[in-house]
Regions:
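A detector of low-complexity, intrinsically disordered, Ser/Thr/Gly/Pro/Ala-rich segments
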Residues: 6-9, 24, 207, 214
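Short, surface-exposed polybasic-aromatic patches that bind anionic ligands, especially phosphate groups
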Residues: 31-216, 222-224
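Bacterial N-terminal signal peptides that target proteins for export
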Residues: 2-14
Length: 237
């Protein structure tokens, strides 16, 4: 009888342990990604450029409350709505994004706009914090890369990213480069992009955990809920 009670208790303890272990992935996800994020600020500067792959791209910056920290987010669906009338609205149902190009470019952006650099970045001297104007330009570049990822247009990451860098640079700096192999200050657009991606593979920009959030807010005077962009946002480790 005592032996049966002992076995019953051991079985119960094992079941509890299994249940606790089963909860760990969910708990880890919850720790990395809040269940919802809120738009704090959406700013459009009225500037746009043309991308052969994406069409017209308008420059904008969006700041979200992400784990009680103001964090830049990016639109995930080119052509859908986003604007100041959505400030205070929420996005939820986070889904992890594991594409290495997206993770690298978002880590690159966050590192240079927040000043959070790895020891490797400091050692290599790639630890310059961008000013406001340059941050807008780089925001447009990373935004275009995310849109291309969602459109399935990142088969050759270095080429795709270089093409968008060329478009952004030409339109915002009023230049007329025609090929990603053209030299800018002695280095081609292709080589610049490849260098950034290679450093990302080495962990120089840090590790960026990226999630995509779906709109869960209500319709506003300017945007119907069904037409609002999903958001990609990350946390730099």
């Amino acid at each position: 009888m005592k032996k049966n009670r002992f076995l019953t208790r051991m079985t119960a303890l094992l079941l509890v342990l299994v249940c606790m272990l089963g909860l760990l992935p969910t708990a880890a996800l919850a720790a990395d990604a809040p269940s919802s994020i809120k738009l704090e600020d959406c700013t459009h500067n009225g500037v746009h450029y043309e991308s052969p792959s994406l069409g017209t791209c308008w420059l904008h910056q969006m700041t979200f409350d992400y784990n009680q920290k103001s964090t830049i987010g990016f639109c995930a669906e080119h052509g859908k709505g986003m604007g100041w009338s959505l400030e205070g609205q929420t996005w939820g149902n986070p889904k992890p994004i594991t594409d290495p190009t997206v993770q690298t470019m978002m880590a690159y952006y966050y590192a240079h706009t927040t000043g959070v650099f790895t020891d490797q970045a400091h050692a290599l001297g790639v630890d310059e914090v961008w000013g406001s104007d340059y941050s807008w330009t780089m925001n447009a570049w990373v935004q275009a890369i995310i849109w291309r990822y969602k459109a399935g247009l990142l088969a050759d990451p270095a080429t795709a990213c270089a093409e968008e860098l060329l478009c952004v640079y030409n339109n915002l700096e009023h230049t007329s480069y025609s090929s990603i192999d053209d030299l800018l200050d002695g280095m081609s657009f292709r080589d610049r992009t490849q260098y950034i991606l290679d450093l990302g593979k080495q962990g120089v920009w840090g590790e960026c955990t990226v999630y995509e959030y779906q709109y869960t807010g209500s319709s506003t005077s300017s945007h119907q809920a069904k037409d609002v962009q999903a958001i990609m946002i990350g946390n730099l480790d």
